[in-house]
C-alpha cells in the first residue's frame, strides 16, 4: 500500500515538473520593444504566488498582501498563480488606460471552476465572458431590470422593508425593556447588526427579484434553507481552487472544493427553479401582470436572441441568481463597515444625526425624497466605499489580445486584478488616506463620484463591466443608513473600539460580529405607525 502511494506521489510530482517546464517556456514574453511588468518576489516553484491569494488565515488577506507588494514593486506588477501570469494594478492612471483605451481587451473573464459549477457554466452575467451573449444579457439587466424607471416602480419594496426593519428593532427594545434584560446596557438593547442588516438586505432583494419575503413565520424552514444556500454560494464563488491555477490537477479535486461547489449549485438551482415554476404557473393561469424581476425576465427572454447555447430557463435562473448574489452580499458588507466606522467616530455619527434632525426632523420618518438633502450622509457612504470597497479586488479579468499598458507589454490570456482597496488608499490622491474623514467629500475632493468616471474612486468598477446595480446599491445604502440613524442612538457594548479586521473572499465582509447598543430616539408613535408586512 505504501509503495502504491509512493508511485502515485512520484507520478504526480513528475507531471507537475513536466508541465511546469512546458509552461515556463511558453510563458516567456514575445520579442517586443516594451518590457514586461516586474514580477513580485516570493514565488514558489510550480504554484507561484498562490499562497498569498489563498485566503488561508496564515497567509493573510489577499488584497492587503497585494497592496504590500505594490509598495515594493510599484502600481503595476505581475504574479504567477500556477500556470497563469497575472498583472496587478493599483494606480488611477493605469486603470484609466485599461478601462478606456483597452476596455474591450480586458472585458472578459478567465475560466474558473466557480463559473463552471456555480454559475450555470458561466451563464451568470458576472462570470460570462465578453461577447454577444454578455452584451445582450447586460442590455436586458440594465434596461429592463435595473433601470431608473424599474427601480422607481420597486421603490415601495425598499421603503416598506426598511420600515419593517426599524419597527422590529423597536419591538425588540420594547421586549427587552419590559422583561428587564436590557438593563446591563442602560436604556438600550444589544443587537447583532451583521445579522439584522444582512436579513434586511436579503428581504429587499428577494422581494424585488422573486416576490419572496423571509421571516420567522410559516416559511421559517424555507428561510433557513435559502440563507444556507446563499451563504454557501457567496463563500464558494470567491474560492480559488487549486485546479484554477494548475488545470492538469483538476481530476484530483484537492480539498474537495469542486464537490462542494456542485452540491451548492444543485441546491441553488432547486431553490430558484421552484420560484421559476411558481411564476410560470401564475403566468399560465393569467393571475396578475409582471411585478417582480423574474416575471419581467420570463416576458423579455421569450423573444430575445441571446446567441448562446443556454436554454431559456437556465438564462432566467442564472440572471436572477446573479441579481440576488450581487444585491444581497455586497450592499450588506458596506452597511456593516459604515456602521462600524461611525461607532468608532462618534462625532461623525452625531453630525449625521444633526443633519437628519435639521432636514427631516423627529415628527416623521425619513423618505427617499429627503436623501438628496442629506449631503453629509452621502459623504459618509462615499468615504466608507473608499476605505472598504465591497469587492476589494473587483472581478478578475482576462486580456483577449496583446496590449501595452503603463508602458509594459501584456500578452494575450494574461489575467488582470485591479486592487481597488490599494487604489483608494493612494496617498498621492488622498490626504491622510487611512483616516475616516467624510468631510473630504465636502471640500477639496467633493468632485469625486463613485459611478466609474473618476478612476481614483471606483468601488463599483468601471468600463463595460461596471456593476449594473450601482444605482440600486447607492439608493439602499443612503435609505437604510438614514433610517437607522434617524430612528436610533447607537453605541458599542463596551468602551473598546469596534474591531475592524477584514476577511478574505469574494466580498470584504467584516471578520468579527458587530454588536451594537440601540436606543430609540423618535416618538413611539412613529415606530407603531409602520404597517406590518405579511
Swiss-Prot record:
Q: Which residues bind heme?
A: 467
PROSITE patterns according to UniProt: CYTOCHROME_P450
Q: Tell me the tissue specificity.
A: Expressed in leaves.
**Gene3D superfamilies associated with the record:** Cytochrome P450 (1.10.630.10)
List its EC numbers.
1.14.14.-
Q: Mind naming one GO cellular-component term on file for this protein?
A: membrane
Q: What class of enzyme is it?
A: oxidoreductase
Enumerate the UniProt keywords alphabetically: Heme, Iron, Membrane, Metal-binding, Monooxygenase, Oxidoreductase, Transmembrane, Transmembrane helix
SUPFAM superfamilies the record matches: Cytochrome P450
Catalyzed reactions: genkwanin + reduced [NADPH--hemoprotein reductase] + O2 = scutellarein 7-methyl ether + oxidized [NADPH--hemoprotein reductase] + H2O; (2S)-sakuranetin + reduced [NADPH--hemoprotein reductase] + O2 = (2S)-7-methylcarthamidin + oxidized [NADPH--hemoprotein reductase] + H2O + H(+); apigenin 4',7-dimethyl ether + reduced [NADPH--hemoprotein reductase] + O2 = ladanein + oxidized [NADPH--hemoprotein reductase] + H2O + H(+); (2S)-naringenin 4',7-dimethyl ether + reduced [NADPH--hemoprotein reductase] + O2 = (2S)-carthamidin-4',7-dimethyl ether + oxidized [NADPH--hemoprotein reductase] + H2O + H(+)
Q: Where in or outside the cell?
A: Membrane
Question: What main location does UniProt list?
Answer: membrane
Task: Report TM segments.
Answer: 3-23
For molecular function, the Gene Ontology terms on record are: heme binding; iron ion binding; monooxygenase activity; oxidoreductase activity, acting on paired donors, with incorporation or reduction of molecular oxygen
The record, for CDD domains, names: CYP82
Recorded topology in the membrane: Single-pass membrane protein
What PANTHER family is this protein classified in?
CYTOCHROME P450, CYTOCHROME P450 82C3-RELATED
Function, as annotated, reads: Hydroxylase involved in the biosynthesis of polymethoxylated flavonoids natural products such as nevadensin and salvigenin, aroma compounds which contribute to the flavor of sweet basil, and exhibit pharmacological activities such as anti-allergic, anti-oxidant, antibacterial, anti-proliferative, and anti-inflammatory effects. Catalyzes the 6-hydroxylation of 7-O-methylated precursors such as the conversion of genkwanin (GENK) to scutellarein-7-methyl ether (SCU7Me).
To which protein family does this belong?
Belongs to the cytochrome P450 family.
What is the designated name of this protein?
A: Flavonoid-6-hydroxylase
What species does this protein belong to? Answer: Ocimum basilicum (Sweet basil)
The taxonomic lineage of its organism, from the top, reads:
Eukaryota, Viridiplantae, Streptophyta, Embryophyta, Tracheophyta
Amino acid at each position: 500500500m505504501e509503495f502504491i502511494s509512493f508511485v502515485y506521489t512520484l507520478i504526480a510530482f513528475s507531471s507537475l515538473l513536466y508541465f511546469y517546464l512546458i509552461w515556463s517556456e511558453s510563458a516567456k514574453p514575445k520579442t517586443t520593444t516594451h518590457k514586461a511588468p516586474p514580477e513580485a518576489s516570493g514565488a514558489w516553484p510550480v504554484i507561484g504566488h498562490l499562497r498569498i491569494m489563498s485566503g488561508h488565515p496564515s497567509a493573510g488577506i489577499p488584497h492587503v498582501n497585494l497592496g504590500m507588494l505594490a509598495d515594493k514593486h510599484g502600481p503595476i506588477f505581475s504574479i504567477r498563480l500556477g500556470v497563469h501570469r497575472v498583472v496587478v494594478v493599483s494606480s488611477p492612471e493605469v486603470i484609466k488606460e485599461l478601462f478606456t483605451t483597452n476596455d474591450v481587451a480586458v472585458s472578459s473573464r478567465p475560466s474558473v471552476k466557480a463559473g463552471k459549477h456555480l454559475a450555470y457554466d458561466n451563464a451568470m452575467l458576472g462570470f460570462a465572458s465578453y461577447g454577444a451573449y454578455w452584451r445582450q444579457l447586460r442590455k436586458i439587466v440594465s434596461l429592463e431590470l435595473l433601470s431608473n424607471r424599474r427601480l422607481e416602480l420597486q421603490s415601495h419594496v425598499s421603503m416598506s422593508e426598511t420600515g419593517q426593519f426599524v419597527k422590529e428593532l423597536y419591538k425588540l427594545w420594547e421586549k427587552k425593556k419590559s422583561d428587564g434584560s436590557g438593563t446591563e446596557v442602560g436604556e438600550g438593547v444589544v443587537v447583532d447588526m451583521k445579522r439584522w442588516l444582512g436579513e434586511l438586505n436579503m428581504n429587499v432583494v428577494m422581494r424585488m427579484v422573486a416576490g419572496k419575503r423571509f421571516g420567522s413565520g410559516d416559511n421559517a424552514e424555507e428561510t433557513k434553507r435559502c440563507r444556507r444556500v446563499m451563504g454557501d454560494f457567496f463563500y464558494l464563488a470567491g474560492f480559488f481552487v487549486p485546479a484554477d491555477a494548475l488545470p492538469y490537477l483538476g481530476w484530483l479535486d484537492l480539498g474537495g472544493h469542486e464537490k462542494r461547489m456542485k452540491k451548492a449549485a444543485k441546491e441553488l438551482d432547486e431553490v430558484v427553479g421552484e420560484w421559476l415554476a411558481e411564476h410560470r404557473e401564475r403566468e399560465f393561469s393569467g393571475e396578475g401582470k409582471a411585478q417582480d424581476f423574474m416575471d419581467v425576465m420570463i416576458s423579455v427572454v421569450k423573444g430575445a436572441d441571446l446567441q448562446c447555447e443556454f436554454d431559456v430557463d437556465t438564462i432566467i435562473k442564472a440572471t436572477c441568481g446573479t441579481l440576488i448574489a450581487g444585491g444581497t452580499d455586497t450592499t450588506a458588507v458596506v452597511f456593516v463597515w459604515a456602521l462600524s466606522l461611525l461607532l468608532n467616530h462618534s462625532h461623525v455619527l452625531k453630525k449625521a444625526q444633526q443633519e437628519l434632525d435639521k432636514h427631516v426632523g423627529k415628527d416623521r420618518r425619513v423618505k427617499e425624497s429627503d436623501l438628496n438633502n442629506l449631503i453629509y450622509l452621502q459623504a459618509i457612504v462615499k468615504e466608507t466605499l473608499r476605505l472598504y470597497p465591497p469587492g476589494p479586488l473587483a472581478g478578475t479579468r482576462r486580456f483577449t489580445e496583446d496590449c501595452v499598458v503603463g508602458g509594459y507589454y501584456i500578452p494575450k490570456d494574461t489575467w488582470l486584478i485591479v486592487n481597488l482597496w490599494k487604489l483608494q488608499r493612494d496617498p498621492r490622491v488622498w490626504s491622510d488616506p487611512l483616516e475616516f474623514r467624510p468631510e473630504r467629500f465636502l471640500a477639496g475632493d467633493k468632485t469625486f463620484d463613485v459611478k466609474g468616471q473618476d478612476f481614483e474612486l471606483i468601488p463599483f468598477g468601471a468600463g463595460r463591466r461596471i456593476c449594473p446595480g450601482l444605482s440600486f446599491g447607492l439608493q439602499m445604502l443612503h435609505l437604510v443608513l438614514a433610517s437607522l440613524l434617524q430612528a436610533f442612538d447607537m453605541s458599542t457594548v463596551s468602551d473598546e473600539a469596534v474591531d475592524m479586521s477584514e476577511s478574505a473572499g469574494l466580498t470584504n465582509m467584516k471578520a468579527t460580529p458587530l454588536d451594537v447598543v440601540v436606543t430609540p430616539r423618535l416618538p413611539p408613535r412613529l415606530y407603531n405607525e409602520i404597517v406590518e408586512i405579511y
